[in-house]
């Protein structure tokens, strides 16, 4: 398996492995356990082969149902041993949230994460629970572009296993673009400060427990994601 974080899966444009990052007690995050990216609907045959050879056996979609089907294709894996799971982590029927963020140019920045986390603990916990209970093999988690919803779940996962905020921010910024950076700068902030405020607002393990995860689910995440036999 490659130990390059940036992965070239033909048909996807924003794919990377969350392995190799320093976590609690000097442990490293395990390669091939969690891969984040954009929607796999456009993967070529070669792209699917690369995904499979990387060890992915579960695809976790974080996308929201009820949108136009042509813009929201259902991903069907060409491999029978790859399980596809859907956990919607946003509720587009929440008019107050949609009016505040979806009509704003800040929708594509982490500024909205605090509101999303406060509103939908059960949805975020369900996504992490799906990872904890996934069949053996790696998990590929995605939304449409691999930025926001995928970013939130990656943020929670990496915090849970003790990756530093600096490294989490660096991972987030691999998907950033100059426009979003400028939007933050115009508000006298940056990605690190926004993620710092987001993390300060929650006690993560209690947040997940109150959202419906069990302690065994949380432990399973840590066991899966941490390479402890160093």
Indicate residue ranges for each PLM-predicted region.
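Cys-dependent protein tyrosine phosphatase-like superfamily
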Residues: 1-140, 152-230
């Amino acid at each position: 398996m490659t130990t390059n974080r940036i992965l070239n899966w033909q048909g996807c444009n924003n794919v990377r492995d969350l392995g190799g990052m320093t976590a609690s007690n000097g442990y490293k995050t395990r390669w091939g356990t969690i891969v984040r990216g954009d929607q796999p609907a456009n993967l070529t045959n070669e792209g699917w082969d690369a995904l499979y050879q990387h060890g992915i056996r579960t695809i976790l979609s974080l996308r929201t149902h009820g949108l136009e089907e042509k813009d929201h294709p259902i991903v069907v894996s060409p491999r029978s041993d790859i399980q596809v799971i859907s956990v919607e982590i946003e509720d587009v029927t929440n008019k107050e949230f949609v009016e505040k963020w979806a009509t704003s140019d800040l929708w594509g920045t982490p500024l909205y994460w605090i509101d999303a986390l406060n509103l939908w603990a059960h949805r975020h916990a369900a996504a992490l629970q799906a990872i904890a209970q996934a069949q053996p093999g790696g998990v590929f988690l995605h939304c449409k572009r691999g930025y926001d919803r995928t970013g939130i779940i990656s943020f929670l996962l990496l915090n849970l296993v003790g990756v530093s905020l600096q490294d989490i921010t660096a991972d987030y910024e691999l998907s950033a673009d100059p426009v979003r950076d400028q939007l933050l700068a115009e508000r006298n902030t940056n990605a690190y400060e926004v993620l710092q405020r987001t993390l300060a607002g929650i006690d993560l393990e209690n947040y997940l427990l109150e959202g419906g995860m069990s302690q065994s689910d949380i432990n399973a995440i840590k066991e899966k994601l941490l390479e402890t036999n160093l």
